[in-house]
Curated annotation (Swiss-Prot):
Record-level Gene Ontology MF annotations: carboxyl- or carbamoyltransferase activity; S-adenosyl-L-methionine binding
Organism name: Trichodesmium erythraeum (strain IMS101)
Protein name, per record: Carboxy-S-adenosyl-L-methionine synthase
Short name of one Pfam family: Methyltransf_25
InterPro entries for the chain: CmoA (IPR005271), Methyltransf_25 (IPR041698), SAM-dependent_MTases_sf (IPR029063)
Amino acid sequence: MTEPLETELYLSSEKDELFEKGPWPKPFAFNAEVVKVFDNMVCRSVPLYREVVAGAVHWTRAYYQPKTRIIDIGCSTGTFLELLGRFLKQPAILVGIDNSSDMLDKAKEKLAQVEQIHQIELICESAENCSFEKSSVVVMNYTLQFLSLPQRQKLLRAIYQGLVPGGLLFISEKIRSDCPQFQETITHHYEAFKAKNGYAQNEIERKKEALENVLIPLSEAEQLQMLKQSGFSYIESLIKLHNFVSFVAFKSD
């Protein structure tokens, strides 16, 4: 019988009003002001965010191999690692990578209790400069989309090479449709989702403008192709709503 997972996330309660009151970052960057409200921002901006984090924990537990590492690329404030640390019974090496020192400061606070059970390593570095050797699970949620296309393929290949046989990549990304009419409808529903979560239209427009040429989404087919070209033998889409999707990719040998 599958053990139930407590999915109550450890999140900061500070409300995201960054694009209402300003000064808002343009172009968008994960600076100290964004970090303060990041937990609230991501929950109100990413559909099914809690389900994605919980799903990543379930898949990590299923594919984790003892004496290997679990790596979270773009770990931000440590929400996934904190939930995983509560759920994973055996001591493990949990690695969080982020190029924002402010994010890692928040993650360190959030992981204080988890650190009593697991070995925690927080690395302030760009993912493309990191090693993924001896990892059985790599999680990368909403991170690859901020890199250039050549960097994305290079990073995915490095992850594949670093994973042990039987290892897993859990990856979530914002995507776009190849069909202009579909994309228009998706955008309409996504902005309605954000409005329902309390964002005013001017906030939505300001953030969209700040993210222009910073977050560059690919189509779902392009995402799958990049994963295949990196060497992954089996790939499945798990969670999808509006213009966000999560995949699992398996390394068989």
